[in-house]
Amino acid sequence: MAFTQKPLPFDPGALEPHGMSAKTFEFHYGKHHAAYVANLNKMTADTEMADMPLETVITESFKDPAKSGIFNNAAQTWNHTFFWDSLTPSGGGGTPSGAIAAKIDSDFGGYEKFKEAFKTAAATQFGSGWAWLVLDNGTLKVTKTSNAENPLVQGQTPLLTLDVWEHAYYLDFQNKRPDFIDNYLANLVNWEFANQNLAAA
């Protein structure tokens, strides 16, 4: 069984009005994400991991330093799919609604405090990595991870993510990562996706 790259949940040009160009997706989805999937299939071919769910490959390979290459490509395959779903071209960003809004109010003390925590995590992740909104033992938290690592290996439930590898923003925002973060929070966050993940947790 081969791992597959899921289609983007929107047209590659759909986020142009919100600061993310089709050119970015041409490279980010079409080259970077595709390469992680291809590498994962090469590394797991003819092994028991080829038939495991992707999440299982991630958690199992994380435990074995000899499988770091498999982990990196499996996690990046999953992380990118989750990131695309964390974006929406219609009605994204701004203050959330529904259950996630109430949970943010109770666990962070309001949306503005969540926003500052998320901006800080994303901006201070040194080098490549990810910022996450997760559910950890029933409580919402903001976390950041380096390189390919994700909250699954810590037993946390991811609700949203932002990719802060340079290739995620350099074509559109150059070296201005804080502007990329602000734009994500203001215009692109898919709160409906976060609500779905919270409901399923």
What do the predicted segments below correspond to?
Residues 1-201:
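Feature for soluble, non-membrane regions of globular proteins
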